[in-house]
């Protein structure tokens, strides 16, 4: 299999991960690249719109094509940079540079052409791709009406030219066969891993360093970094291996106050950033260490808390502060003040720019993931419950309460079910006491614990 081993270094410690073959989708704006990306992926992942230039970040996903795993990359609309175009916005230049880098790192390049019309830009792009001709597959999109357009593009001498309809799925099977050709050996056919990976999301307000952190972890530019807030639109994913764990990491769009989300495309990006919380185990919540926690931070964290996910607070841009033990202690107190009920959450000072603290953060991730997968025997739970009730019985203000037995019902997230004679008579502060004892006594000190109380039904 093509691909490479990448080594990451932090404070003298090294870890590596295997990179799957990368198939990069390129083409001028609005030819249907994102629609084709979504078609090959089998679900909507890239934002599609009639507006030219919607895709900014190079969106990567692991996909199984005909039994073989690879990384599929959707790039922004591609135009060849020239001095005449030098007046374009800085952000657009960054987008182009990212596309160029994706092409240089590709194992195969999928050039998407518009079957309804040719353009002078197509010829510019084709000439730019000449040095990569051996990796190139040309897909003529929007050919619902037939294959006569095949002959218009045949003059360029593509070794592989396929007419497809990304919208309707026409000829996608043939395209998949062309993509995997010569990328794999037969014994590399496999299914995507499901339960042996840690799913992470990098979440926070705009311009706090989420994309810089993602790029540091991937050791290449997968997310655009710019001083302008709101640069990331899609959810960008990448793979890292640390210790014995495999991570799938998602860099989300910065979540702003609702009244500040103007564009429909940005609105969709924010909705996707929030919805990704339903598909991850742990959230790296990143804030600018120079700032305090705002009301918006509290609202975002409440969305995370509702899902009982593992959380790590990353105090980013620590390199810009006069770091000291007392300052770290103060910042941690600020976190406890802002999120009192989440006093179990680890707080790690980091610099996504220099890599300071990143290894510590990843060690925290491993610890939290192990705790999220903890299974406690029912006998051990009820022995502990008896000790807790003996040391601190339930209040009798609203009548006698008897706690019958405790069982664990799930992992990732951790949830316990407590049976009692009068669940409605157990005050909230006693529920918190039980949750804290579960965390402290059962080795779950860094994760949220959901405790549901149900009425015990007597057998007759």
Curated annotation (Swiss-Prot):
What the record says about family reads: Belongs to the TRAFAC class TrmE-Era-EngA-EngB-Septin-like GTPase superfamily. EngA (Der) GTPase family.
MF terms (GO), sorted A to Z: GTP binding
Q: Where is the EngA-type G domain?
A: 21-187, 198-373
Pfam assignment, any one: MMR_HSR1
A GO BP entry is: ribosome biogenesis
What job does the chain carry out? GTPase that plays an essential role in the late steps of ribosome biogenesis.
Where GTP 2 binds, per the record, is at: 204-211, 251-255, 316-319
Q: Which Gene3D superfamilies match?
A: 3.30.300.20, P-loop containing nucleotide triphosphate hydrolases
Task: Spell out the InterPro entries in the cross-references.
Answer: G_ENGA (IPR031166), GTP-bd (IPR006073), GTPase_Der (IPR016484), KH_dom-like (IPR032859), KH_dom-like_a/b (IPR015946), P-loop_NTPase (IPR027417), Small_GTP-bd (IPR005225)
Q: Which keywords fit this entry according to its UniProt record?
A: GTP-binding, Nucleotide-binding, Repeat, Ribosome biogenesis
Q: What is this protein called?
A: GTPase Der
Domain KH-like, chain residue ranges per copy: 374-457
Q: Which SUPFAM superfamilies match?
A: P-loop containing nucleoside triphosphate hydrolases
């Amino acid at each position: 299999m093509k691909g490479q081993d990448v080594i990451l270094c932090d404070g003298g410690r090294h870890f590596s991960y295997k990179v799957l073959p990368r198939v990069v989708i390129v083409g001028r704006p609005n030819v249907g690249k994102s629609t084709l990306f979504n078609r090959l992926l089998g679900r909507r992942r890239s934002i599609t719109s009639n507006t030219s230039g919607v895709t900014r970040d190079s969106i990567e996903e692991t996909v199984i094509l005909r039994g073989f795993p690879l990384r599929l990359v959707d790039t922004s609309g591609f135009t060849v940079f020239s001095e005449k175009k030098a007046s374009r916005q800085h952000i657009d230049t960054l987008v182009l540079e990212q596309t160029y880098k994706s092409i240089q790192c590709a194992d195969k390049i999928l050039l998407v052409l518009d079957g309804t019309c040719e353009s002078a830009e197509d010829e510019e792009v084709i000439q730019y791709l000449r040095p990569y001709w051996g990796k190139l597959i040309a897909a003529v999109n929007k050919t619902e009406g037939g294959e006569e357009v095949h002959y218009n593009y045949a003059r360029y001498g593509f070794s592989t030219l396929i007419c497809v309809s990304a919208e309707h799925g026409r000829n996608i099977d043939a395209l998949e066969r062309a993509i995997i050709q010569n990328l794999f050996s037969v014994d590399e056919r496999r299914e995507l891993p499901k339960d042996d990976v840690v799913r992470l999301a990098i979440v926070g307000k705009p311009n706090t360093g989420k994309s810089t952190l993602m790029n540091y972890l991937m050791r290449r530019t997968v997310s655009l970094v710019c001083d302008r807030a709101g640069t990331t639109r899609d959810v960008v994913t990448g793979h890292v291996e640390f210790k014995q764990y495999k991570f799938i990491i998602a860099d989300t769009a910065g979540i702003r106050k609702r009244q500040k989300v103007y564009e429909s495309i940005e609105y969709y990006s924010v909705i996707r950033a929030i919805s990704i919380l339903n598909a991850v185990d742990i959230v790296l919540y990143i804030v600018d260490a120079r700032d305090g926690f705002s009301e918006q931070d509290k609202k975002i964290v409440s969305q995370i808390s509702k899902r009982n996910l593992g959380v790590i607070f990353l105090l980013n841009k620590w390199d810009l502060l006069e770091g000291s033990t007392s300052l770290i202690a103060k910042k941690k107190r600020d976190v406890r003040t802002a999120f009192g009920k989440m006093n179990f959450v680890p707080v790690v000072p980091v610099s996504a720019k220099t890599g300071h603290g990143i290894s510590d953060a990843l060690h925290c991730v491993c610890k939290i993931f192990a705790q999220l997968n903890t299974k406690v025997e029912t006998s051990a739970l009820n022995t502990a419950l008896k000790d807790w009730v003996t040391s601190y019985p339930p209040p009798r203000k609203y009548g006698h309460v008897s706690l019958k037995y405790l069982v664990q019902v799930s992992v990732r997230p951790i949830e316990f079910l407590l049976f009692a004679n009068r669940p409605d008579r157990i005050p909230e502060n006693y529920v918190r006491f039980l949750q804290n004892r579960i965390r402290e006594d059962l080795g779950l000190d860094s994760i949220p614990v959901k405790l549901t109380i149900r009425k015990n039904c007597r057998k007759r």
